[in-house]
Amino acid sequence: MIPRAVRVVRGWVCGLGVLALAVGVAGCGGPGIEAASPSPTPTFLAQETMCEVVPSRILVEEMSFRTTDYAFEHHTSTGENGANTDTFICNLNGRQGSMTATFRIRIAYWPGATLNASSPYPFSDLDNEPPNNDLQPISFDDVEGRGYIWITNRNRAITAAWLYPDDHALEIQLFTNGEADYAYDQNDIAAMTDLLHALIPAIPPVAARTDQSRTWVPFP
């Protein structure tokens, strides 16, 4: 397995903050206190697109992921050499399949060949990983760049990474909060590959727009 990805996912679970609180699970009762009742059935968003770019069709039909809420932001700027250094962040919470645990998708588009869905590290770290069955190279005929996709954290997380020709990098993570006994497999890899393929061309033009401060849907 790839230790970094495990650390990244754990950091994201611990640092989710306000967005996580919006869909937190019910607490446990203590001595002399009646246990909390089960959480009500969540309300799933019916939008065709989440975070302006994420197709709900792929989430629902291919990943069995139904979104309860999300937050996103994007910013544009110019680097020292005059090149665009745009950023885009999208965090989605939801349910996967028939399970009641919270599942999360985190998406980050970042300059400087940096992967930053949870904590920053260079794309070149993936190139330098020794060959193994977890890290799978990936490419598409109709888009420029190259990437990897892999399963980590005892099969409880999938990560996809993409390096654009202009050295922006895209990272997508799909994982459970640790409460669900679920193991991802090659079918999930195929679904994540389709999501990556859709987002590679969709995110850059949105990230280059006028800055969008962090926006929650629905607003907590």
Please place each PLM-identified region on the residue numbering.
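Hydrophobic alpha-helical membrane segments, chiefly transmembrane helices and signal peptide h-regions
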Residues: 17-18, 22
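C-terminal motif of bacterial Sec signal peptides marking the signal peptidase cleavage site
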Residues: 24-27
